[in-house]
A protein has these predicted regions:
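Bacterial N-terminal signal peptides that target proteins for export
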Residues: 1-7
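Hydrophobic alpha-helical targeting segments used for export or membrane insertion
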Residues: 11-12
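Exported/periplasmic ABC-transporter solute-binding proteins
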Residues: 20-289
């Protein structure tokens, strides 16, 4: 992996004990890993951490350092951090596995309880996007969405490691619904949608749900152009997208996990430190405060 000229501020030096962390060098430069432009996960991260600023004319500017390693998907971000002791990145909490270590943010862990209590700072919605109104969806797509938002669907959301959204009425459903539903977009939303697809198809054998992974912007565009029934986005719609007639429906809440290689001894980092690192204000692990 190509290293950046950036570093990460985290806990005080007392949290670092390198003797048992073979492969980690506190004097090394940090390998920052970011998602690509178009990723809803990136959009949420830069907004929530302050890496994105608003110019005087109101335009939003993403100040992620150009030296940052850009990962084209959740899987690439995960494997990149897992393979480099000095790397750090961010991804959907539901996509984390034991090849990386999750950092606390300002001492708070991204647990379901902390997210629900509003204590964890990096939280974003998983949305599905359609044109005009959900009432205009074809019957199979509308039924699938109704099922996702029901108690049955939201149970699957929670079992997959995410938080349910709002009240969860029982599923009433439509008799005899059939056909194909195409979902397209975010690689962060994809694992959750795959679980929902699997459970829905078991009880609706006449409906086929196809999940196409790309990124949030592609999912939004596909929904607008009628390429898919439901776009998948791990961010809110932009004003221009809303003005084009698109609507978003939240199907889950997800924590953004900031992850490092297991060899890294740091356990917690502040939002301010994340902002400073991803904008290039600090450059080495030994600058940790």
């Amino acid at each position: 992996m190509k290293h950046t000229n950036l570093a990460f501020a985290a806990l005080a030096a007392a949290t670092i004990s390198t003797g048992c962390n073979r492969g980690f060098d506190p004097d090394s430069e940090i390998g920052l890993v970011s998602r690509e432009d178009g990723s809803g996960t990136r959009s949420a991260f830069v907004e929530l951490t302050g890496v994105q600023r608003k110019a005087a004319n109101g335009k939003k500017i993403d100040e992620t350092s150009p030296a940052t390693m850009v990962a084209s998907s959740t899987a690439v971000a995960l494997t990149t951090v897992a393979s480099d002791p000095s790397a750090i990145g961010y991804l959907s909490l539901g996509s984390v596995n034991d090849t990386v270590k999750i950092l606390l943010i300002d001492g708070v862990a991204p647990t379901r309880e902390e997210i629900a209590a509003g204590k964890y700072a990096l939280v974003h919605p998983f949305n599905v996007v359609c044109r005009d109104s959900v009432d205009n969806l074809k019957p199979a797509a509308r039924d699938f969405l109704d099922w996702i938002l029901s108690a049955e669907g939201q149970k699957i959301v929670e079992q997959a490691g995410y938080l349910k959204v709002g009240s969860t009425p029982p599923y009433t459903g439509k008799n005899g619904v059939s056909g194909k539903v195409v979902c397209s977009g975010s690689s962060s939303v994809t694992p959750c949608m795959e679980k929902l697809k699997e459970a829905y198809e078991k009880t609706h054998p006449q409906v086929s749900v196809e999940v196409q992974q790309s990124d949030s912007s592609t999912g939004v565009s596909d929904a607008k152009d009628g390429v898919c029934d439901l776009g998948m986005a791990s961010r809110a719609l932009k004003t221009s997208e809303k003005n084009s007639g698109l609507v978003a429906v939240a199907i889950a809440l997800d924590g953004l996990a900031v992850v490092v290689n297991p060899a890294n001894p740091i356990v917690s980092i502040s939002k301010e430190s994340l902002r400073a690192a991803y904008t290039g204000k600090i450059t080495r692990w030994n600058e940790v405060k």
